[in-house]
Swiss-Prot record:
One of its GO terms (biological process) is gluconeogenesis. Its EC number is 5.4.2.11. Keywords: Gluconeogenesis, Glycolysis, Isomerase. This is 2,3-bisphosphoglycerate-dependent phosphoglycerate mutase. CDD domains: HP_PGM_like. The active site is at H9, E87. Substrate binds at residues 8-15, 21-22, 60, 87-90, 98, 114-115, 183-184. SUPFAM superfamilies: Phosphoglycerate mutase-like. It comes from Staphylococcus aureus (strain MRSA252). Belongs to the phosphoglycerate mutase family. BPG-dependent PGAM subfamily. The keyword Isomerase applies. The lineage of its organism: Bacteria, Bacillati, Bacillota, Bacilli, Bacillales.
Length: 228
């Protein structure tokens, strides 16, 4: 039976500081390391044999993957990384304190940017964009693929092709797959898997460092889901 494990990275240093993070590359906090370690322990305690793992290009997700596989004694399995699993790009909000953003733009506007399905935050500057384009992780990408900012809908548009072309292929082969990613890239996968409405998906809360297991049919229909 195919099994999918979705796990948002452990708390990051910027999560702890209440900052918009998006594509900014920050480390796990001490709490985040503990969460990721505990996630791996839960995988081991539940005797789950992972066949393959997928993660983003951002350190907090990469490190979470490492801790999960290390603590579950499965460091040797293949791990595939893609920018398509990165967090939603928060554009010009990245690096801002969320409370300060509410004071500057108004609480209602910030809520719309954070929780609407198809509204993008303000775009990043050209200088910020050029820094991403120069990053070795992204400098091979067509510039047209690099976002200035993203809505949740935009995030889904880039995540689902990766699901279809890569992740789902291992599940269709009956394997157990770990996806260690981010709040919004995981929301995109949940929306697709469960056919969640645009209105409802924005209210889904994704816990940090908590493995969410999906048991699937051979056709990848959801049979059951539960947190470890």
């Amino acid at each position: 039976m195919p099994k999918l494990i979705l796990c948002r990275h452990g708390q990051s240093e910027w999560n702890a500081k209440n900052l918009f993070t998006g594509w900014e590359d920050v480390n796990l906090s001490e709490q985040g390391i503990n969460e990721a370690t505990r996630a791996g322990e839960k995988v081991r305690e539940n005797n789950i044999d992972i066949d393959v793992a997928f993660t983003s290009l951002l350190t907090r997700a990469l490190d979470t993957t490492h801790y999960i596989l290390t603590e579950s004694k499965q460091q040797w399995i293949p791990v595939y990384k893609s920018w398509r699993l990165n967090e939603r790009h928060y554009g010009g909000l990245q690096g801002l304190n969320k409370d300060d953003a509410r004071k500057e733009f108004g609480e209602e506007q910030v809520h719309i940017w954070r929780r609407s399905y198809d509204v993008k935050p303000p775009a990043e500057t050209e200088e910020q964009r050029e820094a991403y384009l120069a990053d070795r992780r992204y400098n091979h990408l067509d510039k047209r693929m690099m976002p200035y900012s993203e809505s949740l809908k935009d995030t889904l548009v880039r995540v689902i092709p990766f699901w279809t072309d890569h992740i789902s292929q291992y599940l269709l082969d009956g394997q157990t797959v770990l996806v260690s990613a981010h709040g919004n890239s995981i929301r995109a996968l949940i929306k697709y898997l469960e056919d969640v409405s645009d209105e409802d998906i924005i209210n889904y809360e994704i816990k940090t460092g908590a493995p969410l297991v999906y048991e699937l049919t051979d056709d990848l229909e959801v049979i059951d889901k539960y947190y470890l």
